[in-house]
Curated annotation (Swiss-Prot):
This is 5-oxoprolinase subunit A. Catalyzes the cleavage of 5-oxoproline to form L-glutamate coupled to the hydrolysis of ATP to ADP and inorganic phosphate. The keyword Transmembrane does not apply. The gene is pxpA. SUPFAM superfamilies: Glycoside hydrolase/deacetylase. It comes from Salmonella typhimurium (strain LT2 / SGSC1412 / ATCC 700720).
Length: 244
C-alpha cells in the first residue's frame, strides 16, 4: 500500500532540510504565521532538489501566536487571505521551475475549517479559483474535505502521528490534556493503526474510524527528525510505500 508523509516546513526549524529527505510532501509557511519570502524560496529549492511535492500552508494573520489564535473573520476575508498566500508561494514555485501540488491550512485556520462549513467553503473556493488541479488537504472526515469535494477538488484526508483524538474524530485542542503525544512508541502505534486498520483510539478509549491518505509529522516538534526516521523504517518493514 501507499501513504503520503507530510511535514509543515519553513517555520524556523533547523531540521527542515533533513526532513525533506524523509517526507514525500512539504507544506510551506506563507508568511502569515511564520516564514517570509526568503524561507519560502529556500524551502521550495530544497523540496525540488529532493523530489518532494510542494504545498502552500496558509494561516490566519497571527505571527505573534504562530497561527494558533482563534479568529472570527468574514468568509470573504478568509478567501482573500488564502488566495494571497497561495499566490505568493505559487509565484516562487513557478519561478524555480516547479509545480505546486496541494494546499493545507495551518493551525487554527485548519481546526476551525474542520468544523465551520462557511470557513471551509471560503478556503476551498480560494484553492479552486487559483488552480482547480490543486489538492486540498484537510482533517479526515472534516467540513474542509466536504467543501473540497463540493468544489470538485481532489482531496487528501489527513491524520496526525503526534496528536490526540476525540471520539468524534476531531483533534484534542492543544490546551487540553492528551492533545500532544510525546511518547514515540505511542505515536508510532497510533500511526500504524490509522494507516493499516483505518482506526484511531480516542483519549476516552473509544475506537473511531478514520481515513488516512496522508500522515503529518510536525516539523517544529522536538523529536520530529528521529521520529520521521523511525516511521519510515516501520513503513518499509510493512511494505508501506511513502509516495506523494
Amino acid at each position: 500500500m501507499n501513504i503520503d508523509l507530510n511535514a509543515d516546513l519553513g517555520e524556523g526549524c533547523a531540521s527542515d532540510s533533513e526532513l525533506l529527505t524523509l517526507v514525500s510532501s512539504a507544506n510551506i509557511a506563507c508568511g502569515f504565521h511564520a516564514g517570509d519570502a526568503q524561507t519560502m524560496l529556500t524551502c521550495v529549492r530544497e523540496a525540488l532538489k529532493n523530489g518532494v511535492a510542494i504545498g502552500a500552508h496558509p494561516s490566519f494573520p497571527d505571527r505573534d501566536n504562530f497561527g494558533r489564535t482563534a479568529m472570527v473573520l468574514p468568509p470573504e476575508t478568509v478567501y482573500a487571505q488564502t488566495l494571497y498566500q497561495i499566490g505568493a508561494l505559487g509565484a516562487i514555485v513557478q519561478a524555480q521551475g516547479g509545480v505546486m501540488r496541494h494546499v493545507k491550512p495551518h493551525g487554527m485556520l485548519y481546526n476551525q475549517a474542520a468544523k465551520d462549513p462557511h470557513l471551509a467553503q471560503a478556503i476551498a473556493k480560494a484553492v479552486h479559483d487559483y488552480d482547480p488541479s490543486l489538492i486540498l488537504v484537510g482533517l479526515a472526515g472534516s467540513e474542509l474535505i466536504r467543501a473540497g469535494e463540493r468544489h470538485r477538488l481532489v482531496t487528501r484526508q489527513e491524520v496526525f502521528a503526534d496528536r490526540g483524538y476525540q471520539a468524534d474524530g476531531s483533534l484534542v485542542p492543544r490546551m487540553q490534556p492528551g492533545a500532544l503525544i510525546h511518547d514515540e512508541e505511542q505515536a508510532l502505534a497510533q500511526t500504524l493503526d490509522m494507516v493499516q486498520a483505518g482506526r484511531v483510539k480516542s483519549v476516552t478509549g473509544v475506537w473511531t474510524t478514520v481515513t488516512a491518505q496522508t500522515v503529518c509529522i510536525h516539523g517544529d516538534g522536538e523529536y520530529a527528525l528521529a521520529f520521521a526516521r523511525r516511521l519510515r523504517a516501520a513503513f518499509n518493514a510493512r511494505n508501506i510505500h511513502v509516495i506523494a
